[in-house]
Amino acid sequence: MQYRRFGRTNLKIPVLSLGGMRFQKSWDQLDFSEVSYEEQNKVENILDLATQYGLSHVETAKYYGTSEVQLGMCFKNTKKIPNIIQTKIPPNSDPEIFERDVLSSIEKLKVKKIDLLAIHGINTAEHLHPVSYTHLRAHETCHN
């Protein structure tokens, strides 16, 4: 697998990543108990195969339905956790809501930290300004 430096950081990121948009039973935010064995097994098999191929970066998002919770169960039940876990949350000008979204993703993914956090859906200049302020708190939340 080829790697590149991620922006101005020292993080080496693979040129291919595993997208988790279709890792969901539903686009709705459902509890894991509503996910069937077959649906979860599909995600586990894909994650296992991706790991065998050297894909060490997986991404998901709050708005990908049950994707975060299903990936979280995979991470809980296996030792094959990708080196880089990324999720996306919506922009929010309220730092408490922003932080709550970050912590919710960490909880659903059953990890101690998120390696990469993306802001999903910055569609206007108004969305960007609050993000520049609140991302500092998210950084502290993700890395402490």
Residue ranges, per PLM feature:
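Single conserved hydrophobic/aromatic residue that forms the stacking wall/gate
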Residues: 135-144
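Acidic-and-aromatic substrate-binding clefts and catalytic sites of carbohydrate-active enzymes
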Residues: 61-69, 91-98, 125-127
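Active-site groove signature of glycoside hydrolases
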Residues: 109-125
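N-terminal binding-site loop/beta-alpha segment at the start of enzyme catalytic domains
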Residues: 1-82
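Charged helix-capping and loop-helix junction motifs
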Residues: 100-101, 130-136
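Aromatic/hydrophobic pocket-lining residues that form the small-molecule binding cavity
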Residues: 43, 98, 102
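Active-site beta-loop-alpha junctions enriched in small/polar residues
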Residues: 21, 63, 88-92, 119-122
